[in-house]
Amino acid sequence: MSLEDSLRSLSLDYLNLLINGQAFSDVTFSVEGRLVHAHRCILAARSLFFRKFFCGPDPPPPSGNLDSPGGPRVNSPRPGGVIPVNSVGYEVFLLMLQFLYSGQVSIVPQKHEPRPNCGERACWHTHCTSAVDLALDTLAAARYFGVEQLALLTQKQLASMVEKASIEDVMKVLLASRKQDMHQLWTTCSHLVAKSGLPPEVLAKHLPIDIVAKIEELRLKSTLARRSLIPHHHHHHHHHGHHDMGAAADLEDQKIRRMRRALDSSDVELVKLMVMGEGLNLDEALALPYAVENCSREVVKALLELGAADVNYPSGPSGKTPLHIAAEMVSPDMVAVLLDHHADPNVRTVDGVTPLDILRTLTSDFLFKGAVPGLTHIEPNKLRLCLELVQSAALVMSREEGNANANSSNNNNAPCSAATPIYPPMNEDHNSSSSNANLNLDSRLVYLNLGAAQMSGDDDSSHGSHREAMNQAMYHHHHSHDY
């Protein structure tokens, strides 16, 4: 067993203590009228807040309270007493405990489940108002209870969410980031609000006046930076540069909105006219990622055939390409049409993730967890087909690179050309053999087990109840697909 497997097993063992409720529990919390059983030693070891709360020098009173205004109480409740928690909700408290017990947590609601503040049916809750609210509440709880690792994880999640969230939600995160001195998140959100084009009088209805002033300052700096790249031949034009650039930015925003409406109505000809007549840049407008996520295969194909969009253009802070997005959607049609137009299956995001990595992770989760609520959107046959398509494309590219390298070697060493194989021997190139072995293993794994994993949930009586407990609403997995 590898070190990673050992740590994962240890994490699950501790998490099972929390899931099993009263087993070996020596402390009970009351959150929103519901009891949560936990273990003092684990909480004290993982959180300075709980360490002070449970191990204070004063005699324990009949009951404790985690919500004292001066910070963590040093008074500990007597064994058997119920500790009321009023500062956070039940779901957020369980998410925090899950992180304290296992070191892992997914700070998003389960996909497709009904949520407050989200009226969209079948929403994936990756960047909707409900998902943003849950992340903000989790961040506040992590800061309140001094769980800094969870706070950092939540900040990273929010930074990913706001790229696709509504401008109202971005402003909520902006306020929270200033209140809690989260400078990187502040920078991300302030630039998004600045680029939104909302006039100051509208921003002032949602934000304090000093923040509105900072947003306007950002806009001015951005305008000046763009002006510095453009030669000015007339003093009059220079004098009115700020106004002209602001108008140009508004015009670009209008173009993007028109483009999206055209794509929504499958009017690719209008998009073509905008490219040819108005100079619309499809890559900067994120036309292809938008079409992959919101339009039909035919629209995506027609857009690619215009020849004006880079199929491998990285978009958003994560650097995901359209193929990454199609892989997360588990859409064989989209994956196929992108690969047909030379999408690169080996391209990596900023975090080093390839489309093949995404599909492998989904396959692993599906096989391990079965068709739990968080994975119900995945159809085994579609996942298998997506994996096969991307694997095949990766293998073809690997062989083409091998041919190119072999030909280059032959040209440089003509006398040795007869002894140079077209493909390097598998045992001489560890990386190549590892990659091909992984492809073959993935293929066999999907063929043999993917369909069975979905059907065997009811038959596996020895592990069924345990797996069901492991996949309660507060223990779910997330694959974000922002761009």
Swiss-Prot record:
<dbReference type="GO" id="GO:0009609">
    <property type="term" value="P:response to symbiotic bacterium"/>
</dbReference>
<feature type="compositionally biased region" description="Low complexity">
    <location>
        <begin position="403"/>
        <end position="419"/>
    </location>
</feature>
<dbReference type="InterPro" id="IPR024228">
    <property type="entry name" value="NPR_central_dom"/>
</dbReference>
<feature type="repeat" description="ANK 3">
    <location>
        <begin position="318"/>
        <end position="347"/>
    </location>
</feature>
<keyword id="KW-0833">Ubl conjugation pathway</keyword>
<keyword id="KW-0479">Metal-binding</keyword>
<keyword id="KW-0472">Membrane</keyword>
<feature type="binding site">
    <location>
        <position position="128"/>
    </location>
    <ligand>
        <name>Zn(2+)</name>
    </ligand>
</feature>
<keyword id="KW-1003">Cell membrane</keyword>
<dbReference type="InterPro" id="IPR002110">
    <property type="entry name" value="Ankyrin_rpt"/>
</dbReference>
<dbReference type="GO" id="GO:0019897">
    <property type="term" value="C:extrinsic component of plasma membrane"/>
</dbReference>
<dbReference type="InterPro" id="IPR036770">
    <property type="entry name" value="Ankyrin_rpt-contain_sf"/>
</dbReference>
<dbReference type="GO" id="GO:0042803">
    <property type="term" value="F:protein homodimerization activity"/>
</dbReference>
<dbReference type="GO" id="GO:0000976">
    <property type="term" value="F:transcription cis-regulatory region binding"/>
</dbReference>
<feature type="domain" description="BTB">
    <location>
        <begin position="25"/>
        <end position="109"/>
    </location>
</feature>
<dbReference type="GO" id="GO:0009864">
    <property type="term" value="P:induced systemic resistance, jasmonic acid mediated signaling pathway"/>
</dbReference>
<feature type="repeat" description="ANK 4">
    <location>
        <begin position="351"/>
        <end position="385"/>
    </location>
</feature>
<feature type="zinc finger region" description="C2HC NPR-type">
    <location>
        <begin position="115"/>
        <end position="129"/>
    </location>
</feature>
<keyword id="KW-0539">Nucleus</keyword>
<dbReference type="GO" id="GO:0009877">
    <property type="term" value="P:nodulation"/>
</dbReference>
<feature type="binding site">
    <location>
        <position position="123"/>
    </location>
    <ligand>
        <name>Zn(2+)</name>
    </ligand>
</feature>
<keyword id="KW-0863">Zinc-finger</keyword>
<dbReference type="GO" id="GO:0008270">
    <property type="term" value="F:zinc ion binding"/>
</dbReference>
<dbReference type="GO" id="GO:0005634">
    <property type="term" value="C:nucleus"/>
</dbReference>
<protein>
    <recommendedName>
        <fullName>BTB/POZ domain and ankyrin repeat-containing protein NBCL</fullName>
    </recommendedName>
</protein>
<dbReference type="InterPro" id="IPR011333">
    <property type="entry name" value="SKP1/BTB/POZ_sf"/>
</dbReference>
<dbReference type="Pfam" id="PF11900">
    <property type="entry name" value="DUF3420"/>
</dbReference>
<feature type="binding site">
    <location>
        <position position="118"/>
    </location>
    <ligand>
        <name>Zn(2+)</name>
    </ligand>
</feature>
<feature type="repeat" description="ANK 1">
    <location>
        <begin position="254"/>
        <end position="283"/>
    </location>
</feature>
<comment type="subunit">
    <text>Homodimer. Interacts with APP1 around the plasma membrane and in the nucleus; this interaction disturbs APP1-mediated regulation of the nuclear transcription factor Y subunit (NF-YA1).</text>
</comment>
<comment type="pathway">
    <text>Protein modification; protein ubiquitination.</text>
</comment>
<comment type="function">
    <text>May act as a substrate-specific adapter of an E3 ubiquitin-protein ligase complex (CUL3-RBX1-BTB) which mediates the ubiquitination and subsequent proteasomal degradation of target proteins. Transcriptional co-regulator involved in the promotion of leaf and floral meristem fate and determinacy. Required for the abscission of senescent organs, probably by regulating the cell wall disorganization in abscission zones (AZs, e.g. pulvini at the base of leaves).</text>
</comment>
<keyword id="KW-0536">Nodulation</keyword>
<dbReference type="GO" id="GO:0099402">
    <property type="term" value="P:plant organ development"/>
</dbReference>
<keyword id="KW-0862">Zinc</keyword>
<keyword id="KW-0677">Repeat</keyword>
<feature type="binding site">
    <location>
        <position position="125"/>
    </location>
    <ligand>
        <name>Zn(2+)</name>
    </ligand>
</feature>
<keyword id="KW-0040">ANK repeat</keyword>
<dbReference type="Pfam" id="PF00651">
    <property type="entry name" value="BTB"/>
</dbReference>
<dbReference type="GO" id="GO:0005737">
    <property type="term" value="C:cytoplasm"/>
</dbReference>
<keyword id="KW-0963">Cytoplasm</keyword>
<dbReference type="InterPro" id="IPR044284">
    <property type="entry name" value="NPR5/6"/>
</dbReference>
